[in-house]
A protein has these predicted regions:
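Extended, folded cores of ATP/NTP-driven motor/assembly subunits in large transport
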Residues: 1-316
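Pre-P-loop entry segment of helicase/translocase ATPase cores
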Residues: 303-332, 336
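Glycine-rich phosphate-binding loop of nucleotide-binding enzymes
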Residues: 325-364
Length: 364
């Protein structure tokens, strides 16, 4: 979720004046769009990427598996009319440069790489990166702090991602999910459950020697045993798999005060969605690498096991904004409050039909 140059966006959608007698209408239209820009969320642009990783015996087999996974995702998410494009190497490099350097970089091409004799890292990496602070990173003259979702509520939904995107914060979110074979996951769960039950019996025997007889011991231990039971039951009945999951949030700011204020907003949004955010103290470098869309998690010991259904609902595709570059104003997205701009000249059939109730503004 990155900031866009609002003035450039205005210039791309407002009607230029031509002094041909129709300028009052253009000015009225421009004034209406200007007020919608101020009321909407067009000062931020959300870019959504999916990265897949696959280990196999040979690169050829791994590439074949990746292609199958990509087509599977594309087919599944097409049901909610979310369109996908496979990124080229140049496009991936430019997206990474946008994330790390903002607008302060030239467009990357492989021809430039050949001429310069440099690597893609020279085009992507910012002039300076400092990891000397325990809780944040310095990127040029800006700050970035990476935090993670430590605890999840009983019910998960897509509202947290939607609220965070609409909170007027410059953030990067990364959701890692690494699956395992169902039989292996259930075996591990049963082993953990057995160990916890053995621990429970041990504590009961210890209390019995002291003359205390209780059916239940530690509340946390009892809760963990019940949770393991529920997971096994759900996996057996629904066919869900278990995934090692890590939800990271990177917050950008210009000063430490702004960073703290932004983090407070993130924690408030998380709290309203029954989630708990925690810092990654002295782990910012590994967290930074995990935040980038490489499809690899470099952090250890902070992941959480979630079921397929829990992960599937965390979708960033809650609405689709139609904003063609150089397009004209066609209304307001009722979900995101962003304006809709369409360049009908790019369509196979640029003709259109305007429908609406009486007095709804069809004449405009």
């Amino acid at each position: 979720n990155k900031k866009v140059n609002l003035e450039q966006f205005r210039k791309s959608i407002l009607y230029p004046l031509h002094e041909d007698g129709f300028d009052p209408y253009r000015e009225e239209f421009n004034s209406m769009m200007d007020s919608n820009l101020e009321a909407g969320e067009n000062n931020f642009s959300a870019i959504k990427l999916i990265s897949f990783g696959k280990s196999d015996q040979t690169p050829k087999l791994a590439y074949r598996s990746l292609s199958q996974i990509g087509e599977y995702f594309k087919s599944g998410l097409s049901e909610i009319e979310a369109s996908f494009n496979l990124l080229t190497g140049e496009e991936r490099a430019n997206h990474l440069a946008d994330m790390l350097r903002g607008e302060n970089h030239l467009p990357f091409t492989y021809q430039d790489l050949v001429r310069s004799g440099q690597t893609t890292k020279h085009f992507i990496a910012p002039p300076s990166l400092s990891f000397k602070h325990k809780n944040h990173i310095e990127i040029d003259n800006r700050l970035l702090q990476v935090v993670y979702v430590r605890d999840y509520g009983m019910e998960l939904g897509d509202k947290f991602i939607r609220d965070l995107i609409q909170s007027d914060l410059e953030v990067m979110m990364s959701l890692h999910a690494k699956g395992s074979a169902k039989s292996e996951a259930m075996k591990k769960l049963r082993t953990k459950k057995t160990l916890m039950e053995s621990q429970k019996i041990g504590e009961q025997q210890k209390m019995a020697r002291s003359g205390v007889y209780l059916e239940k011991v530690s509340q946390v231990l009892e809760s963990n045993i019940d949770e393991a039971d529920e997971l096994l039951k759900t996996m057996t009945q629904t066919g869900d798999k278990l995934f090692d999951t890590l939800f990271l949030i990177g917050v950008f700011a210009d000063t430490e005060d702004q960073l703290n204020q932004s983090l407070d907003i993130v924690k408030q949004v998380a709290g309203s969605n029954d989630l708990i955010i925690d810092n990654l103290t002295y782990m910012q470098e590994a967290a930074f690498n995990s935040l980038l869309p490489f499809g690899k998690n470099y952090l250890e010991g902070v992941s959480r096991s979630l079921l397929t259904s829990n992960i599937a609902v965390n979708s960033p595709w809650t609405s689709v904004d139609i904003q063609d570059k150089g397009g004209k104003f066609y209304g307001i997205n009722q979900i995101s409050s962003n304006i809709i701009t369409i360049d009908r000249g790019k369509l196979n059939t640029p003709s259109g039909l305007i429908l609406g109730t009486s007095g709804s503004g069809k004449g405009m």
